[in-house]
């Protein structure tokens, strides 16, 4: 591999994330807190940075957005009962909910019809997999 090829791989052009920044309006702040609360309930407060890193690696959130999300998460207090009781892994449905939060933070509204269609499509794929693979 020559130097030009190697440098082009290393200096690959930046592909924008689905969520580059967190909007500054109060509506977005509410959505951020609700999203972080959702994640904390699923994986525990201390595991939220790992989830955000996973979303970064998927190209869903930028490093700039993660920095702001982490600032928000520092302001979230948990009841003693909630601390580290939910340290499970996120399900596919949990990731889809996160993706919907990301879309809303980008100002995109997802209609209930689109959600119903998505849910129907997921059920159809699952049913096909069950029939094909005998799951």
From Swiss-Prot:
<dbReference type="InterPro" id="IPR052494">
    <property type="entry name" value="Flagella_assembly_related"/>
</dbReference>
<dbReference type="InterPro" id="IPR006752">
    <property type="entry name" value="Arch_fla_DE"/>
</dbReference>
<keyword id="KW-0974">Archaeal flagellum</keyword>
<protein>
    <recommendedName>
        <fullName>Putative flagella-related protein E</fullName>
    </recommendedName>
</protein>
<dbReference type="GO" id="GO:0097589">
    <property type="term" value="C:archaeal-type flagellum"/>
</dbReference>
<comment type="similarity">
    <text>To M.jannaschii FlaE, also to FlaD.</text>
</comment>
<dbReference type="Pfam" id="PF04659">
    <property type="entry name" value="Arch_fla_DE"/>
</dbReference>
<dbReference type="GO" id="GO:0097588">
    <property type="term" value="P:archaeal or bacterial-type flagellum-dependent cell motility"/>
</dbReference>
